[in-house]
Every structure is written in structure tokens, then in C-alpha cells.
Amino acid sequence: MGKSRRNKDENDSNFSQKKERVDENTINYYRRVTETLNEGFSTDEDRELFLDNVFNQLEEDGPKVCRLASTSRVLEKLILDAQDKNILQLLKAFSQDWIVLLSDRFGSHVLQKLICQIPRCLSKISNEEDTEDETIYTYFLNLCNFLKDNISDARTDVYASHILRVVLQVLGGVNVGEQVVRSRLSRNQDKDGQDEINMDNFSPSDKFKKVLLKFTKVILSSETLNMEICSATNNPLIQTVLLVLHKVNDQKCQKYLKKLLCIPGLFESNEESLPVIAKDEVGSFMVEQILNLCSGEFYTELYKKLFKGKLLLYAVHPVSNFILQRLITNVKEKEHFEEIFGELCGYLEDMLAVNHLGVVTRLAETCHRLGCNQEKLLRSLKAAFHCLEPVERETKVAPLLLSLTTYEIYYGMTDSDVKKEDETDKEPPKKDPVLTDINYHGSILLQHLLKFGNPKQMVTSLLELKPVELKNLACNPCGSHVVDAFFQSKTIGEKSREAFVNRIKGQYLDIACNKNGSRTLEMIWKHVNTSQKIAIATELGKQEHKIRGDRFGFFVHKNFGIFQFVQRRKDWEENLNANLKKRKLFEEILGVDSSGNKKKKGSSKSEDSQLKLEDSDDEEEAKTKKPVLYKRKLGYEQTIPGSKKQSKEYQLKDKKMKHLLNEVTGKKKKK
């Protein structure tokens, strides 16, 4: 129903045009063009001659054939190989009627691909307005004028709005790429166009910048901006305008950001409710972008107006919790973070209970980045996973984080076991589980904790895992990055790394013959000393034929020089020492440490390289569904936790949090 209505709305646009009929001979011609391109050419001259002939034909056929599914693909491929004169030919052909392509499902992609090549063409000339290539410049400005004159239709058309976004990027000489905040589904469906704009050596002219400012004024001064911000078509366009303006003229960008904040009906709220825009599935993306782009001064103003005293409301809301994550990620002053952390740290278990794990990982990430509240966070996490008391439980925090389960669930304790422990202060006999499954969010959380200033408790807990559990960790897609963080951390000493290597003795072959394990083992190899490398090579050398015959182990066998180690150990050691000397010399010349990070002048420590971590929650699912508890792992059995269930589960302990969650989910107490 929704789909048909959307198509109907698009057809009602002034941009909609009927497609011209294309004869079969023309279609067959472009099919043969595809075959010829795939076969290749003997010389560059033949290829250039062929392309010239095809583009000469496209001057006549271009506007028609680009609107067909099969032939539009051919044109997109041709455009990537086109010379400047060919780009000019197509621009000339398309300029006869821009409207035909702007709203067409396939033609818009061809035009978008063509616009992406304009910076490449214009970067070759010093002044676009005074050269023979002036026509590319003027045809592009002609398209800009057409879009500006028809902005009301262009910004609401699902295809024309994409063209408009690419045009804005070319005008500003900025490729925003994936900086536009949107759903994961949208990101996957729209990977063409924007990522292919090559802005290298391209500096837009003053004329381009003036046109950009005109577009900005028209788009951000709309009388219906309050509705457009919550529109799936307009929201990415407005974000693109702000992103480009941020690079070209940040002063004006900050001015428009403040103007957005004054839009009536979107940002107003009281102490017990969230702003309308923060709860909207599309509008919330704009709030995230504002947090990304705002200056330090404006961040403070924004925090006081929208967030202060209401962070718990954001934390439990299925949409707004992503805004809270962005707020935490973008905080730069310790004073601000102290205030945010103080308001949230007492509710970590409650956030885990509603499955908003991203907020917790962002807190850990920022504690690491700003170097504050690290001990407080670790203590709160241990309390949330029920391993703070008794003291004996503290060493079990690593497997609890990695599996993302509470102590009682992980060790299979019953209600009677918990009650008995409370009465006697002694731990009853419990199961001895083996860690096999690693939770993605738990992995990210532990990676940050290992980078803290004093990760002693996490290191101790990790080293208490069984050798087979450490093997499982190294071979797991998520767990292997925890091992990376362990060896790359500047706050973990040589003795701890050596203890880890000794702990996994007997597991090297299994690790080396695993897809993730082989990569992890090579990373470990780079961070251990010569004696530890000899120990690893000795164990692998005993099974040299097995590791050499394995598809993954083969690379370890080659990179570690296992064959040479077995046959000519003395030569192997000499090569190893020579490589170490070269590496140290190379690091001294470049001024980097052993991990490849640049050293700070006047300081022996180098900044931690940030791990590339993805958004920790699935935005698409979380914004369209009610909070669903992770029953299999966490032991949840109800949609809203906090009922009279055993204390071993994560619970909403705070009455205020229960009340907030009831409001968010629409539940009211029975009288």
C-alpha cells in the first residue's frame, strides 16, 4: 500500500516524463559495445577510436538509452573511461532536456555518474572560465541553474534529490562520502555516486562557491523546513548542505545550525519529555549530524537545551539512544563528560536490561579517549555483571564481558545457590563453563578497557582463562580483536604479553590453521621478543607438514620462516636479528614506535591508535522495533525487565528508570 502511494506521489511530480520507445537495433548496438569493452583492445589508439565512435552515437541516442535498465549500465561503464571531450559530448546531449533524466530511475544514475567526473575534468585547467574547456564549466552551471529554478520539485523527488546532493559536493569541492547519517539499509542501497567523486587536485572557483551559498540559502530557508527535516528524501539533502558548508565556510555552517535549533515544534521539550525530532526515526539523524558539526561553544549550548537532566530519557528510548551515543562520542571537554558520566554511570545495568549496549560502549570509548572516570566505569560494569562482590568474583569479569552474561547465568547458578551464597558468604559449587561464543558488543567493550591507564584487573582476568578459551578467543571474528588490543595496548607490560604467549602453548597449531587465528598469530608475532618467537616457531616446527598444507597455516609457515627454522635454525636467527635491527633503524628515522604510531615530541609515550569500531547497535532494527531482550544470552524472559524474576538477571533496579521505560514503551500502570 505504502509503495504504490509513493510511486503515485512521484508520478505527480513536475519532473515525471514518459519514456521514449527505443528500437531493438539500438539496444543490440549497445549490447555489442559491452561485449567489445569486455574483450579489450590491442592498442590504446584502437580503444580511443572506438570510444569516440560510441560517444558520437550517444550525442543522438544518449537521452533515450540512458533511461533503459540494460543500456544505462553500459553508459555508466563508458563514462568511467571517458575523456574530457566525451564528457562534454554527453553534457551537451543531456542539457537539451535535464528534466528527462533528473527523475528517471536509471537516467538519474547515468547523470550522477557524469557529474562525478566533472571535478576530474576541471582540475586539469587553471581557470575554468577562460579556457577552451569552458563548455564543461558552463554546462554544469546550466544544470545548477535549472535545479535552483526547480528546487521545490528537485528536493522532493527521490532521484533528483540524489543529483542535487552530488551537485552540492562538486560546487564545494567536498566529498562527504558516508558522513551523511542514515539507516544501514539506505547506506547499503546507495553506494554509487557519492563515493566516486574524485576531488583530488580540484579547487572550486569563486563562482562555484557563490552558487553553493545560493543553494544553501534556498534549501535552509524553506518555510516547510520543520517537515522536510523529518522526510527521508529531504533529510540527507539538508545534511549534505551542512557537511559541505562545514568544509567551505564553517562560520556560516554554525549560523545555520543555530537557526535549525530555533525551528518551532521540533526542539521544544520539558523536563519529563524528549523533543519531537529526537523521537523521530528520520529527524533524529539530523540531531546526530548537528552534534557532529557543532563547535565547542555550540555543543555546550545544545547540551544545556536538549540533554541536561534528561539523559536517562534518551538512554531508554529505542531511537533517541543513538543521539545519546553521538553526544558522548563528540564530547571534548572533561568537565562535560564528568557531568554526562555522573548522570549515567549508576544505570549501566538498566541500559543492558533494555539492550542499549551502544551507550555503554560509547562511555567506555570516551573514558579511554579523555583519560577520566576509568576506575568508576570498571566498578560500575562489575556491579552490572554481578561480579563486584564477593571479591573472588572480580577475576571473572573478562568472560562475563565477552559472553555478555551475568555471573549467575554464566556459571549456571540457581535461585537457591544465590540465596545460600548470600547467607554463608561462600560460593557454592558451580559449573565450569568453557568460553566459546564471543559477543560483538562485549568484544568492543573489552577492547576499550584493555586500553585504559590501569588495565591490571582486565589483564589478570583474561590470563585466567583456560588455554582452549584463549584459543577460541583468538580464532573468533570478534574475539581476535580483543587479542589485538591486548598486545597493542601501551599500558600492558612485556611480562603480561609473555604470560599470554606462554598461556596458549600447545594451541599454536590450531590458531595458525584458522582464518582469524592465523591473522591474530601474525599480529602477536610482531609484538613479542626473540625468545618468544623461538618458542612459537619450535612448536609450529614440530607439525611443519600440517601447517604448510593448510590454506591459512600456509601464510604463517611462510611469514614465520618455519621451513628455515627447522632446517637451518642458525640462519633463521641471524635473519630475525637483522630484520629487528632494520626495523629499529626504520622506526628511529620515521619517529614511530614499534606499533607504527608517531611519537610525540618531548614525550616517550605515543598516542593510542584508535580501533576502527562500528556503531554498536543496529540502527535500522532498533529504530523500527521495540526493545527486545537477548533471551538466549542474557537470560531475559520478559519484554520489560524488572519484574519479580530472580536477581541473577540484569534488572531495572531504579524506580525512576522503570517509570521512564513505561512511558517510552507506552505502558501505563493499572490503577
Sequence positions of predicted segments:
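Eukaryotic gene-expression regulator signature that favors modular helical reader/repeat domains
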Residues: 1-671
